[in-house]
């Protein structure tokens, strides 16, 4: 499955690994937050492994630089002009990101003879490359192109982020990272992603264990 250091994919790894072997794949694109995100994912996976209750394969890292597509001045690459807490969710959209990441992961699945690719997409994701139609068409296209059946799954497609938090409330969610401008590995507390995270914990009725810059937890 495509994995990041964020809440959604971390919980999905844990849920799927209760009943099957999961092969987490992280794709490095050169985005400003990736170093902190990948470190967070590593910590979370190690914590799962220490619990010895889930079957998770070693993390696979792939490379797909997006600077030629977005330009090095784009906020996602430069870290400057990151959408703030009050910005619309659409301001976070990175054109074709799920298509790009999914394509690379699908090739890996085909070569490794893994028949399914899981994505941690949520029901309130408004972007065109997160719709049921996209997932269906992408699965068909990938299977045809690779000559191998690839089932593209989105188990959380009907859930909101607060439901995912409730589902994973017994997991070490403090190890996850959902931030577009992390500071020394911590959430900045000011970007759209941090705002979304705070709101989701509040709606879930679960204490937010996140360490935000400035030392504040909510």
Tell what function each PLM region has:
Residues 86, 171-177, 196-201:
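A polyampholytic, Gly/Pro-enriched intrinsically disordered region
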Residues 44, 137, 191-197:
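Short alpha-helix boundary/capping motifs
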Residues 69-70, 75-77, 179, 201, ...:
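Short clusters of hydrophobic/aromatic residues that line enzyme substrate/ligand-binding pockets
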Residues 169-189:
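Immediate flanking context of iron-sulfur cluster ligation sites
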Residues 183-186, 192-217:
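Iron-sulfur (Fe-S) cluster-binding segments and ferredoxin-like electron-carrier domains
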Residues 1-171:
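ATP-dependent adenylation/nucleotidyltransferase module used to activate substrates
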